[in-house]
Amino acid sequence: MSTDIHPIDSRLSGMLKSDKVLKGIFNSIPCPSIIEMCGYAGFDFVVIDNEHGSADFQTTENMLRAARSSGITPIVRCFERDIPRVLDMGASGVQVPMVETPEQALRLSRMI
């Protein structure tokens, strides 16, 4: 039996540097099955919204597992305090809301 496993990787960086038009989806529904369907539907990435969405960390981790198993690159929209945790869970990247200055952006980029 062969299984296609998508470990934590650097696909996001490569995708952003390519000339390819990327297809992504923004999801705030705390349901791993939706993430899995997006992967099998051919989306390149998904942004899991933990700012406005109602997913707890356990559900977020399961959504990240669903992303990996279906081949979609997961990005988590989260607050600054949650960056280390969601990266440890397997997010390929983070989107941090309310970044208002270049200095703040630089400081956040150094956390990753």
Identify the function of each model-found stretch.
Residues 1-112:
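Expand to "…catalyze enediolate/carbanion chemistry for C-C bond making/breaking, isomerization
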